[in-house]
Amino acid sequence: LSPAIATGITKTGVGVDMVDLSSADPQEIQELVGHASGVVLGMPPLQASGDLSTNFGAVLAAMQPKQVFGLYESYGGDDEPIDPLRTKFLDLGLREAFKVIKVKDTPSEGIYQLCDESGTDLGQNLIQAAKIKQLKSLDSDLEKAIGRISGGLYIITAQKGEVKGAMLASWVSQASFTPPGFTVAVAKDRAIESLMQVGDRFVLNILEEGNYQVLMKHFLKRFPPGADRFAGVKTQTASNGSPILTDALAYLECEVASRMECSDHWIVYSQVTNGRVAKAEGLTAVHHRKVGNYY
């Protein structure tokens, strides 16, 4: 579970140090914690060794008020109760980056997704202030000019095993005739990015002008880690296994062929394998912006 949380954090550009508390030196732990912006801990076994108990104490002693924390059960069958340790962190005035992750059964794909998304939430929490500062420093005339680049409105939906994802997108452009293909820009810290690796399959749902507000509003919500993004939304299953939004104007079934890395996004080139238009006279919804420093 630790690597899944770490992967989610690193998606946001935040660095991660992983430490085995059963063997680390207490002085090293205090130095690492003292320089960190946040700490994530897995629960130790009930019958923890003296060194492990000492090192957990070293973590608590080194924590500072502006740091964030996250806790998860290790599913070893005999973990320490998670709630008492959470209370200790809260009593220190620390902020909880994500809800405690409780693992009652053998970790499933859904649990790993929960861990990944929880890590991403933590990372986004840490870089929020820096992002705001960066946006304020941008050239306003340049951003207004870039904002005149418009695009359609789409919702990407994907499913791999138990794991589902969805994302509202507007940075979409056709990129090839034969085979038919297009590109979509996906922010590195988006949860669905892990479902859009080379060979992965997904659906591009094309929204209709004058009939997109309900779907757009739903998928713009900030979902907590592990939440079902399709609850309350009419869907059917595509031949590639991904959800199709019933109220979309059209849909394309796609397979990721290649990816190009940019500074804060992945440009994902995908080939289209199937598709259908629900309303022949319908027009694609268009998204107009005023500035280019947000979607």
Model-derived features with residue positions:
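A short glycine-/small-residue-rich loop at the edge of a beta-strand within enzyme catalytic domains
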Residues: 24, 47-50, 183, 210
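Generic recognition of flexible, low-complexity loop/linker segments
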Residues: 27-29, 256
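Residue-level detector of flexible, active-site-proximal loop/helix-junction positions
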Residues: 23-25, 76, 101-107, 211, ...
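FMN-binding flavodoxin-like domain, especially the glycine-rich phosphate-binding loop
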Residues: 1-22, 29-134
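Alpha-helix N-cap/loop-to-helix boundary motif
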Residues: 20-21, 28, 48, 148, ...
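Basic, polyanion-binding surface patches
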Residues: 128-295
